[in-house]
Amino acid sequence: MTETQFMNFYNEYLKEQILPTMIGKGLGQYSNPNNRFHNFEQLEQLKKEPREKCLTDLVGKQIVCLYDIMKLWDGKLTPRLNNLFDELIKDIIIYMFLLRGMIKELEMKPKVSGVGLEDWHE
């Protein structure tokens, strides 16, 4: 795939798959109209873990599912498998946008003392 072909694919995928879900069509699955992070905040209460951790747990589930499929995949693409790839990849991308939004929201809050991301080292 050339750079131009990839950019065309990328733009079309965002326009037809990601944006409709993030903006409205699938909104109820990820949040309520007044709070984009509602589901994760509710999960935070249930699990007693930060909403960002709850979100990354869900992403982990999607990645493990994708990984398991790839281990067994023989390289043939059926319509059902193609749809499954689309759903998993789309969900992972949307979760990443939501995580970035949560981090952005944290950036806008007043700083509190304690261990934070700035103390984390690779």
Regions found by a protein language model. Give the residues of each.
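Intrinsically disordered, low-complexity regulatory regions
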Residues: 1-122
